[in-house]
Every structure is written in structure tokens, then in C-alpha cells.
Amino acid sequence: MAFEAIRLITFDCYGTLIDWENGMLADLHPLFFRGGHRVPDTQILELYGEIEAELESGPYLPYRQVLAKTAQEIGRRMSLPISSEQGAAFADSLTRWKPFIDTLPALQSLARKFRLGIISNVDDDFFAETRKKLAPVEFDFVVTAQQVQSYKPSHRNFEEAVRRSGLSKDQILHAAQSLYHDIAPANALGISNVWVNRPSIRPGSGAAKPGTGKPTYEVRTLAELSALVSSASA
């Protein structure tokens, strides 16, 4: 692939730029470590990935509801009931999830050469809070699930990003950690992509539903991504 043609890099946000596994576990642990129970992190994360994908594949729900319902369904399957208030409190925790340590340096470096965009399975108000944690980096546009009323891997989210960019697909590179949500649909649409294969903080598949997409490139950190595209386009 000739990186010289790339004008825009779009990013998945949660799991790629934001450390969602540590973020969600911080608020899920009190719900599942009680009454003598201690549900393993691997089980919590894998159930999260499975249930979230099920909810997102049905009729559109705001992500706030997806998060709350996911927590409640995990509790139901673990015989540890989660109230609607506890589910809502877990949803609110997203605003506290923090960027990975390499996120801001990599984005700032990439922004010197490329336009940057976001394609995220999230509500607008949630991303508005996350955006503050990514300052001073500026994004040309942000496509949320709320705006298009669908969740990745729906092609609509990516098609809207292409439309807003004003570019052809061969001028866009998409970077993400989820094969299921991002790499597979990017491939189907002919958008070059980089799999940011961040190892899960726990053994197993982590919080993203397993997928089979074959990436154009693979890196393990955003620092590697920055080095890859910067050296190739120098």
C-alpha cells in the first residue's frame, strides 16, 4: 500500500484510543465481587463482548442503554442481579475511561501529516466527555452510532465517514482494535486498515466480540502505527 495517497486516518475510539477494559472493570468489579462471588475478569469481558454485540445488532438503542442492559444481562447469567440503577451507573462510568498511554503522543504526531476522524459506537454526549481527554488533538469529524442510528459493523457508519471526508476510499486508512466491529467491514468496503492488536489485559478474547477480518496491516500500539505510516510517507 502506498501511504503517500492517504489523506485521512479514521479511528475506532473505545479499545483503540481509550482503555475500555480497565475502565469498565473498575465499575463492574463491585457488581460481581459480592456475596462470596468473584467472577473472573476473563468471563466478565467475554460476556460483555457477546452481549453488547447482540444488543447492537438488534433495533437501535442509545449506547447508554446498551451499556446498562449489558451489565444487567451479565448479572442475570451470573445469578447476580443488577438493578436498573446499577446498570445506569455503570453506563455513566464511560465518561471516566482514560486514554492509553500512547494515544495522545501518537495522535499528535499523526495530526502533523494527516487529517484525523473518529468512527465510534457511542452516543454524542459520551464522546463529548471523552473528547476532552483527547485534547488538544482536533478531529475533522466524528461519526457516532447515535448520528447514523446503527452500530459497527454496519457499513452505514463507515459510508457516512467517507461522505463527510469528501475523499475517495483509497485516500482513507482506518485504525482499530476490533476485527469484528471495524476490520471486517472496512475490508468489505475496500477501505485500507490497520489492526491495532492491543493484547487484552486478561487472557481470552477480551471485551470485543471475536472476528475474522484480515487487516491490511497489523501493529500492537499506536506508537507503532505512527512510526509505520510516518516512515512510509516520509
Regions found by a protein language model. Name each.
Residues 3-101, 112, 127:
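N-terminal helical cap/lid subdomain that shapes the substrate entry/recognition surface
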Residues 1-9, 39-40, 81, 104, ...:
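Asp-based, Mg2+/Mn2+-dependent phosphohydrolase catalytic module
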